[in-house]
Amino acid sequence: MYNDKIEIESPYGHITISYGRHNKHRVRVLDIDGGMESATYIEEELQNELLFEYMYLFDLMFDENYLEDRQINDVLLIGGGAFHYPKYFLAHHQGNIDVVEINKVLYDISNKYFYLEETINKFDKNKNRFHCYFENGRDYINRNKKKYVARVK
């Protein structure tokens, strides 16, 4: 099973799901048109942990040294990929996260292969902390009146 590749066509590119290792742990990888887009650990206890170093920079917005007496309750993420950061956010923070993803196929894949649905069920039982909007990110920002303390792209 872990040597298999899954190939999926979407309106926004050819998607490949494959398997590999990162620091001795099994991972599932999402590529779009040959470029790595996202990944997740397969072991249950690691599924909501960050795999990519740069994503820890996203989390600096929650560091008390950067907050300057403000609380981050609402975060907007443009582009969900395999929803790696939203899973981490739900598992490690108390606020709300909205994700704008133009490719609904990625959301469906994330639920099926990247543990998004399990994470939502575990950390957002009332279904009010995570929302996904399927549209162009710029259109969403231009149209939406909601104020976000943090926007991540």
Question: What residue ranges belong to the model's regions?
Answer:
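Rossmann-like AdoMet
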Residues: M1-Y66, A91-H92
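The AdoMet/dcAdoMet-binding core of the Class I SAM-like
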Residues: Q47-K153
